[in-house]
Amino acid sequence: LTMIAALATGCAKAPADDGGSTNLTGSLADIVDKIYAAHPVDLSLGTENVDITDTAWMLPQFTGLTSAEGVKEAVVSEPMISSIAYSLVLVRVEDAKNAQSIAQQMKDGINPRKWVCVEADDLAVCGYGDVVMLIMVASDFAEDGITAQAMVDAFQSVCGGKLDFTL
């Protein structure tokens, strides 16, 4: 019941500090759960917090960022088997006005071949309020309905049908 309550309330919207778009409320893990409720992905996924202070490995490995400046928190959802090219990352930024700039840094810095033996050749980055989503997946999964666009659409649904940007 707790999970159902979290899913039902975890992604409410709150006014952004800058008076512009609204921000998603709830934890990033709750938002990931809502995305998967909107578009299930059957890849034995796990969702974990990203240590944004680890700028030597963890932050760039999962977000593409080399600095945590402007970042509040991040989570990554990936298969528990490391040779599957699928990664969904949510980053909450400190100021929604900087979300698109940080999203561009993520897109420019992410390594779609981080798995070495497989590559995520389908990539999208989008944002709403203070949350940026990066999704990358091997196009081999398109036949199963797992594409970057499908996950962008699911995130858009969680955001009430509107995104602030898509890169």
Say what each PLM segment does.
Residues 22-79:
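Surface-exposed, low-hydrophobicity interaction/linker segments
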Residues 34, 38, 105-113, 154-162:
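Structured segments of extracytoplasmic/periplasmic soluble domains
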